[in-house]
Amino acid sequence: ISITVNRFYKNPKYQSFKSNIHIFIDDKLANGTWPTTYIDNILEINPDCKIILNADWYYLEIFSKYRNEKNIFWIKLNLISSFFDNFKTDLTKIVSMGGGVVECAISLSIFLGSKNLNILGVEGNGISRLMCNQDSHFDGEDGDYDNHNSLMFANDMISSARSIRQWHRISHLLDKRNINIYNLTKEGILDAYEYKSFDIATK
């Protein structure tokens, strides 16, 4: 099973494997920062891909055309506690997430029966790179942040800090469940999960 998220479908490498599942839960898709044509683009490139959307968006007018789309699934989300084991992976009820879409993908992978999870392309230092006017994504700088001021970056850092704590929390919870999780990206700060080379993971 391969799961991709957000704008990864724009990566040239996407054409080589075309994921089974793609997830959008970022509010940027609901508030207009990202166009809903992202969904159309994925279905055009990869017609068999199952797309996961946030159930809170179901009745928003901009998503009305997708309500009866057979390859789109709407899921309810629940934040992971840093103190209690409320990590839920039952897709038929509610799926846990932490600071964002990566944690949701982990929950979904476990629900689908995965015991060995590999994460690729998560560095965890995107906000700090943007603050230093450096490229933060595979396609360069993120245009979503062109008009960001210091307060907006401060709020983003709070969200990033929560995500990092959630990665470590998930690592602890998965260890208790005998589920292995690996990081295939050597750059960045994602040290909550053991590093494994991409070549070994794809043998």
List where the protein language model places each region.
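Metal-ion/cofactor- or nucleotide/acyl-coenzyme-handling active-site neighborhoods
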Residues: I1-K203
